[in-house]
Regions:
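Conserved donor-binding/catalytic core segment of Leloir-type glycosyltransferases
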Residues: 5, 215-233, 239-242
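N-terminal strand-loop element at the rim of the active site
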Residues: 7-14, 32-96, 188, 193, ...
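A conserved mid-protein helix/loop that constitutes part of the nucleotide-sugar donor-binding site
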Residues: 15-23, 229-244, 261-267
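Nucleotide-activated donor-binding/catalytic signature segment of Leloir-type glycosyltransferases, i.e.
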Residues: 54-61, 264-285
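An aromatic- and histidine-rich active-site surface loop
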Residues: 95-109, 121-142
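Membrane-proximal helix-turn-helix segments that form the acceptor-binding/catalytic region
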Residues: 108-116, 149, 153, 162-181
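Donor nucleotide-sugar binding/catalytic pocket of nucleotide-sugar-dependent glycosyltransferases
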Residues: 144-147, 153-154, 172-212
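Acidic donor-binding loop of glycosyltransferase active sites
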Residues: 293-300
Length: 300
């Protein structure tokens, strides 16, 4: 039996990454010893989410300590110089940037937690935690340490001001320290190979829901689901498209299920187009299957 650890920022909250992690970890736990190490606080633990309580998964909580100002200031200064290319973004400076963005005080805690449990495989869930693991790979006992990407290449590296836009070279240099990288599509795999000279494997997300009911064109309803952030879904573009479509298709409606920082702007956009009676924003729910079953078209 292999001991596998998934290191994530959150599992006890609502989101697509959390749901996929729960499904994958649950399936693997049937034959192996699986631990999810999360930055969630212990009081956030809710085993009803994603049916986690029905799986043979162990949960551990880790709290990375705050950084004192005498450690924070030099790290912050170096990070600024690196990201603005005032210093060259070569392998050694990229390694130092990895240390400056994940200071020694926090690295020490994570190394101790992971090594004390003697895992065979450690998986960093998403880019930033994978980069943390890359910076300490040489100190970890695990046989394999893997980074699992949950956002597209273009969102990571080609979105100014967000994600890894100023860290492309750091990612290129640091991720070679890991024993593997997982991406979600073959299209992204090809981009990593061509632009970063990294060679990930592509593993598509599994079906994470059991279908209940059946949608029908007769409902004349579009459905889209996800976090309300321009970087991840682009619901603003969807609303603009629906506003055009709605001019000549009076019976159709649009429902968006989700929450996030873009919600107030989306509500204003809906009001600007006078679509309050045709576009609905619903909160995240654990009963999302009912929304799928009442829709005609799902917009990804």
């Amino acid at each position: 039996m292999i001991k596998i650890c998934f290191y994530c920022d959150s599992i006890f909250s609502v989101g697509g990454v959390q749901r996929i992690l729960a499904v994958i970890a649950g399936a693997i736990s049937a034959k192996h010893e699986v631990t999810i190490l999360t930055l969630d606080k212990p009081e956030q633990e809710d085993l009803n989410m994603y049916e986690l309580g029905q799986r043979n998964i162990r949960f551990r909580h880790i709290s990375l300590p705050p950084i004192g100002k005498w450690e924070y200031l030099p790290c912050k200064t170096y990070s600024y110089l690196y990201k603005k290319r005032i210093i060259p973004q070569i392998p050694i400076t990229s390694q130092w940037y990895g240390y400056s963005s994940f200071p020694h005080t926090q690295r020490k805690v994570l190394i101790g937690e992971l090594n004390n449990e003697n895992y065979d495989i450690i998986v960093g869930v998403h880019a930033f935690l994978s980069l943390q693991l890359a910076s300490i790979r040489h100190r970890l006992k695990a046989r394999r340490v893997v980074g699992w990407m949950h956002t597209s290449f273009n969102a990571f590296f080609n979105t100014p001001g967000f994600y890894l836009y100023e860290q492309k070279n750091q990612f290129r240099h640091e991720m070679t320290k890991l024993d593997g990288i997982i991406v979600l599509t073959n299209y992204d795999r090809e981009l990593y190979e061509r632009e970063l000279n990294l060679f990930p494997i592509a593993i598509y997300n599994p079906l994470s829901l059991t279908p209940e009911g059946e949608g029908s064109p007769a409902y004349k309803r579009f459905l889209s689901v996800g976090r309300m952030s321009h970087l991840t879904k682009g619901f603003d573009i969807l609303i603009e498209a629906f506003a055009i479509f709605a001019r000549d298709n009076k019976e159709w409606t649009l429902e968006i299920v989700g929450e996030g920082p873009e919600k107030p702007a989306l509500l204003k956009q809906i009001a600007r187009h006078k679509l309050e009676n045709r576009v609905t924003i619903s909160p995240f729910t654990r009963q999302i299957q009912k929304h799928y079953a009442s829709a005609s078209v799902y917009i990804l």
